[in-house]
Amino acid sequence: MNQPLAERIRPQQLSDYISQLHLVGPEGSLTQQIAKGLIPSLILWGPPGTGKTTLAQIMAQESKRPFYQLSAIHSGVKDIREVIEKAKQSSGLFTAKNPILFIDEIHRFSKSQQDSLLAAVEKGWVTLIGATTENPSFEVIPALLSRCQVYVLNAFTKDDLEALLYRAMKTDVQLQNKNIQLKETEALLRLSGGDGRKLLNIFELVINATESDTIEITNEKVMQLVQKNTVL
């Protein structure tokens, strides 16, 4: 299966994570907790494409905890209970630390679905990490929110986005052997809207649409291809 560029270069360790220095930089509020493996139940709140899922996976990886993931869009109470039961069984088998249960788009869970998480969080069967693009104060039930710390992720800055582009060209196996000349980045950055995943999707679109040996990335070319793709 041909994975999207964003998935192929997804960071696997904290040192490769781009952006959110206020959380995971040298003085970040999560840095020491991750290093010590003392990760509380928490909510990651931020716009799309800002690294919420990646950060959750890295926290599990670096703290050597089992990692379970659910999407609130496709999961119901039955799925939640099944995963919690698996997490309870794995806890203590491979590690003394409780498993991480990551729920993407947790704001889409109903009250009853969120209620079904309470006992597992309260009794420490799992460490809950929820990701949301919506204000958790309005979308997460008070009983669950009071048991979680909330961390805000920001849209990627210009420097973050450019670093992401250069990392893609340097580290991705499929791009390494291509002669890519990044002449201009303004259109790419503007169209991304601070969304790292969207940036990489557009970048890959432009690269795949170019048949010549040398791939020149210019603002005009980016706009033409994106407009053509949107129309189609």
Where are these regions (language model features)?
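C-terminal engagement/docking regions of AAA+ P-loop ATPases
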Residues: 218-232
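Conserved AAA+ ATPase "sensor/coupling" helix adjacent to the nucleotide-binding pocket
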Residues: 147, 160-175, 205-209
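C-terminal helical "lid" of AAA+/P-loop NTPase domains
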Residues: 186-191, 197-211, 221-224
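Walker A/P-loop
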Residues: 2-3, 32-71, 85-88, 118-123
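Short glycine-rich substrate-engagement loop in P-loop NTPases that contacts/grips substrate
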Residues: 23-28, 66-100, 111
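Conserved catalytic/switch belt of AAA+ P-loop NTPases
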Residues: 35, 103, 107-146
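Conserved AAA+ ATPase "SRH/arginine-finger" region at the nucleotide-binding site
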Residues: 71-73, 149-162
